Amino acid sequence: MPFVNKQFNYKDPVNGVDIAYIKIPNAGQMQPVKAFKIHNKIWVIPERDTFTNPEEGDLNPPPEAKQVPVSYYDSTYLSTDNEKDNYLKGVTKLFERIYSTDLGRMLLTSIVRGIPFWGGSTIDTELKVIDTNCINVIQPDGSYRSEELNLVIIGPSADIIQFECKSFGHEVLNLTRNGYGSTQYIRFSPDFTFGFEESLEVDTNPLLGAGKFATDPAVTLAHELIHAGHRLYGIAINPNRVFKVNTNAYYEMSGLEVSFEELRTFGGHDAKFIDSLQENEFRLYYYNKFKDIASTLNKAKSIVGTTASLQYMKNVFKEKYLLSEDTSGKFSVDKLKFDKLYKMLTEIYTEDNFVKFFKVLNRKTYLNFDKAVFKINIVPKVNYTIYDGFNLRNTNLAANFNGQNTEINNMNFTKLKNFTGLFEFYKLLCVRGIITSKTKSLDKGYNKALNDLCIKVNNWDLFFSPSEDNFTNDLNKGEEITSDTNIEAAEENISLDLIQQYYLTFNFDNEPENISIENLSSDIIGQLELMPNIERFPNGKKYELDKYTMFHYLRAQEFEHGKSRIALTNSVNEALLNPSRVYTFFSSDYVKKVNKATEAAMFLGWVEQLVYDFTDETSEVSTTDKIADITIIIPYIGPALNIGNMLYKDDFVGALIFSGAVILLEFIPEIAIPVLGTFALVSYIANKVLTVQTIDNALSKRNEKWDEVYKYIVTNWLAKVNTQIDLIRKKMKEALENQAEATKAIINYQYNQYTEEEKNNINFNIDDLSSKLNESINKAMININKFLNQCSVSYLMNSMIPYGVKRLEDFDASLKDALLKYIYDNRGTLIGQVDRLKDKVNNTLSTDIPFQLSKYVDNQRLLSTFTEYIKNIINTSILNLRYESNHLIDLSRYASKINIGSKVNFDPIDKNQIQLFNLESSKIEVILKNAIVYNSMYENFSTSFWIRIPKYFNSISLNNEYTIINCMENNSGWKVSLNYGEIIWTLQDTQEIKQRVVFKYSQMINISDYINRWIFVTITNNRLNNSKIYINGRLIDQKPISNLGNIHASNNIMFKLDGCRDTHRYIWIKYFNLFDKELNEKEIKDLYDNQSNSGILKDFWGDYLQYDKPYYMLNLYDPNKYVDVNNVGIRGYMYLKGPRGSVMTTNIYLNSSLYRGTKFIIKKYASGNKDNIVRNNDRVYINVVVKNKEYRLATNASQAGVEKILSALEIPDVGNLSQVVVMKSKNDQGITNKCKMNLQDNNGNDIGFIGFHQFNNIAKLVASNWYNRQIERSSRTLGCSWEFIPVDDGWGERPL
């Protein structure tokens, strides 16, 4: 069903219903205007806006243009009936295009439902419409009636391309910011759109970016509609809350204050400029405003000015604000419902998300100040359709967004030139002491007698330099921790899957009816919306500099197109002082070839060679082994843009290696992270439960602190670093285009020197030449983008994250001392729990929380670069064993030869997991290239691998050290060996002096993190310092090795159990790496986190969790209990039973019994999963095995209370009961593989995570939404954390 009620024509006769003359608030003496009601609560006025604000009624250009990138004035636009008809049809077409998407249908329904709150009465027990939320509709008989509305679309005011969303009045009440909301009008035109450079954004397809692209006007309208949604629901951010920029330096953009409201509406990583502390402030503020509205509704006893009933209007606002209502009719704000509504309005509804649904190309940042404007006509279907926009299917415009390409689809786009009232806001950059005569640097109209070389630089081409005032920093504030301290749920990244979940649960019914409003005054008057005061900056400010800047280098590459000959030069100075010279950063050979005059007979060969050389020059890349996370360098970026502090040596690569990515930054960001605020722990005398809960809350709040600091750093990185990188990206595109233009001009000049007869013999096409040069530029931009992205991520990971981690580690150390003292002080209350809690505190606070960029941004370009950054660490390895293409191979650049014995076993599910037995034929031999055989007393090296060591079952294993990885020759080298409860690293020099570093673990423990479980081992060796062993990213032991002399290792690495007395012994190993450097702690943690494969769920041992495989269950809150079934059927239940009991052998092991209780089997929900592996967010069924028969885990969601008791039902009997489970991974440093199971109803609504609840001292399994609210509590404090335990030979227990 379409959104627009019917097809309207401007000349259709008025009927007083959906076509009428209307008067809007604050219109004064205006004549009524013809308007069209395209949908309930939404009108369109195809007129220029000369009446909403008396001060904006003049359509002529103002005497002083606005401080914006571009303005456009044309007083004749939208003055004829044909233009108005086209406007009306264009607007309605865009509404249909928006409504055709799931996201657009949700947004428009929210707008229609967003009736401004009736807070117009001075009596607090009375509801009354606010008059400025109404219009007066002229009836055919000349009378009028008043009608409430939500939105008006109206033509632009004087500046045709200033699209904006505003309120009609009563802004003195702050309606758009107090939860009430107010009627909105949007100044908009479907007849104009803006350009942007695309190839700056796409990294993989050189066919894209052949020129400038045009924004789909549906995206522009959607952006303004999102503003309208914010303002209708009263959650718009105060316009005075802005993102400020510095303005003092020559390179800094002036006069720009981007409102937080605009950043939030755009979404994407721009929204991350608003740091989490400020965002939390906004969320809490509006939560309280919604509570005020609920309170007002509860007080209301009457309604005036309408025939609608009080109860009807209360229901309208209940639907709008998603209020809860109890049996007495009292309204309240449910925090979960509020969070969902607020998230939808502010994070789901964004321009960035609409781009994904429209499947169009778009600017990647709100800070896109492109000055290109195009006239368009979207009404004809041959130009633009509801489903495709400009990129018409079944035409050449469908591929590569060609429909938006203003050069390919040039019939649809008329670029506006010679703007009336175009205002150029600029800075004047002057270099002292250069005497100028006739130079290109002095723009027309400037004094030619200046002794300084000066250039004009448009303000919007300068660096976006954010002020420190933008970043709130409350991280140093202390906090009191109690047993009921609120733990914030983790924010879920916005994905298409999440939006689809919102869509599936969105209520599209109950659209509010038109209600009768008593006639208001014929001229509705309210206070006009106040606009923020924007500080004005002087135009043309002059800066005297001592050296050329990036902008001088770019100006030196420009030239005036004319009939005179130009020539390339490698001298910036010459190019700036001589209008006929153009600076190039290409080689001197290229300069000689392009500047050389050519005879007609040689012309085509000359052109072909120049195109080839141009491609060769732009394709130039360098590589270095000295920077692990930057794999390619574009050496000409330095001389192209004057970047790098070693350029006087023409060595940009050297400068990068010497200084790192910081050389790209014009201003170095400062991140002021203070000493983090401490926790004050509240004591509870003689209350064990509350004391334990306080400790748990402190650990959970510690996790929040890490998250806050990471968010804060990412916000600073995006705003301060990535914006600079993006400007360099843009300027490099301009620089390459300048080179292409100069090359074309020289070739064209040469062609025009020939006689007509000579030209006739030359088959030359300037457009074909342009196409070839553009293709070379676009291919070059792929490498440039890759390099710049790597530099940006490198700066984040090497200069910013470590600084934050150091602050956090100091905080952890302080908290650890406080918690251990708290446990000691309350030891009398914590009887039986002291040791467990101390271990928990020590383990939690000894482990850093790995940084994952995907938690904080959803920009795929940056995320893929971050992933590549992790992989680059592996790429520094000189041996990297992986199973690929049915072979075990070395993925390092050395490709070592590998010999595999006949008794080596590869796991069928993950063939990287290799099983070695205690057999002569069970071995792997790696033959190293001579270049990487270790033979040194100074060079550092590291190794890493994952290992699973089965339990030691008998005394034969005591005091039996055996080697598993051996690189020794002539009693010199290194090896890895095992002993009962030990992993041992040995280094031995040629004089047989050795050093050992050992990790020890116990087999006398109930539930071990190490017995038969995958462990990540890293050993680093700094020859002038220590050898260190890390387990799961944590430093365990270190010993000095500076006393060792030369170590000459073998050229063979042997993986084999050597010297083991137990003939039944075996091990599992995977992901072996050898590095020719000392890995630092950050690299170890990054490598560990990446190889943990957190997107795949793991079982108790660390293997991949599988479908159709039986598992025993371990609840991490109460690990001494197991799951049992009371009875099958809807009246039966499952529960935790205990204790587990023990399995033991004297002096060898003493452990809890793991194979106890009911077995669970995970079944596929849909057939889309091609393998048998369970992944994060998989939707599954859970079967329960009772007496060798499978039953389905399910619940009746209509049960009273939050906790829904789970039952084991006959599978055919499940019917409409809730049975779908969403699997969630919770990877705790790769040791404990926690899983959470979120039960949903048949509509996809969350019932809650599966845990347990005490009913009459029986711990019954339930699905509870309480867990969903507390999900970020520390791992062992919630009953919804589970581990799946399969039977495994390495554990040695006989299943019951």
UniProtKB/Swiss-Prot annotation:
Entry cofactors: Zn(2+)
Residue span of region Belt: 492-545
Enzyme class: hydrolase
Protein activity control: SNAP25 proteolysis is inhibited by 1,10-phenanthroline and 2,2'-dipyridyl but not EDTA. Inhibited by hydroxamate compounds with halogenated benzene-containing arms which directly bind the zinc ion.
Disulfide bonds: C430-C454, C1235-C1280
Positions of region (C-terminus of receptor binding domain (C-RBD)): 1093-1296
Pfam families: Peptidase_M27, Toxin_R_bind_C, Toxin_R_bind_N, Toxin_trans
Assembly with partners or alone: Heterodimer; disulfide-linked heterodimer of a light chain (LC) and a heavy chain (HC). Interacts with host synaptic vesicle glycoproteins SV2A, SV2B and SV2C which serve as coreceptors. Glycosylation of 'Asn-559' in SV2C probably contributes a 12-fold increase in affinity to this interaction. Depolarization of target tissue with high levels of K(+) leads to greater levels of receptor exposure.
Protein name in the entry: Botulinum neurotoxin type A
Organism encoding this protein: Clostridium botulinum (strain Hall / ATCC 3502 / NCTC 13319 / Type A)
Classification of source organism: Bacteria, Bacillati, Bacillota, Clostridia, Eubacteriales
The encoding gene: botA
